[in-house]
Amino acid sequence: MTLNAPKVKVPKLKIPKIVGLPKQASTALTETRLTPPDYILGLDMSLSATGWCLYNVKTGVRQERVLQPNPSASKKVVPILGMHRLVWLRERVTNLVLWGAPERPPEGARISCLVMIEGYAFGAKGSSGISLGELGGVTRVALYDLNVPFIEIPPTQLKKFVTGKGTAKKEHMLMEVLDRWHEKFFDDNICDAFSLVQLGRAVTNTQEGNLLAHQKEIVSDVVKAWQKDHPAAA
């Protein structure tokens, strides 16, 4: 016959807390951002209407406009075309990144600027596509020669940052910018330049408010791409 052993209640031991021990380090990944510059310039390059937006990181002052080589449609005005137009746009972009103005100030001091430039849209065909490629090349070489850091943002990436969809149309971009940043634009070129500045603020951790999930994803991709292309600066 087997005897059943009596059940013994084991008292629960209270483990005293030891004051002064450091808490366990979090395993969450730290978000990496780029070093904030003095200014962030958004450029939506175009042969007819280049939208630009310049933001002062320290003061919060912002200005935006459109660079138009040929603002007048009058036949009496000789249009700026070909190589002269490329030079005209290059000079004004250079002035923006160096002195913060389309025209060089008499006694302007050079500024620290990060340029966010929208990448090529491959929908253009024929001579128009070739001219846009020339403009993009001239602009990028000018920035490179001036040792001005610039980040190229594909149009789909910019659209996703603003709207959550990489296929958003221009009117959708205008509506989302109004809804999120309370800025109303009637020109989609300026709207894109403004959006590029907001992305630039996000990658340098100078944005206002919290980022949405899809915006964090874009910021992470942009920073990783920058660090890959610039290992010495990472």
Positions of predicted regions on the chain:
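Phosphate- and other anionic-substrate recognition elements at nucleic-acid/protein interfaces
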Residues: 2-234
